[in-house]
């Protein structure tokens, strides 16, 4: 019995050390295009890279939140999105939705069922949006590969003078028989185009005039 706490402590310490090493993995700059910096880093247990996209925009937080929460508008700016629809609107800040993604030949199209939450830090006014897979909520479709691993995180940090720093982190696996090296080679193209189109959406009148109760603009 006396040995059990020691063994448990060793395992727990090993876990903490492993987590610390993973957390300390630095982002590496892959490219800088159109004012958007693209970073990559290794992930534990897979050869597929995690990606982060960073830029600065000039837009009210209300406008940013309006674009992010309008699921039916995703086809206008999310790269290769063929059809996006809300499955369940839990609240103004939480939803489940479906997205069908166009994949290049010879690969089959992909789809995702996702759970998204958005919230604001009342002290810093930073806006957070986290989206994770909810692939079990809707049946899979014929000739379409369901993406079951997906985690997207947006962070919008006000930096003064009406400007906002944008950090978009993406961790996913498209599934199917696509080699990891091929995924890593082209994986940043879609999200990069998404970021560019997202900035265009911020200029649309239907979003610029939005008033959302759960978001406070920077003064």
Where are each of the predicted segments found?
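Eukaryotic helix-grip
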Residues: 25-219
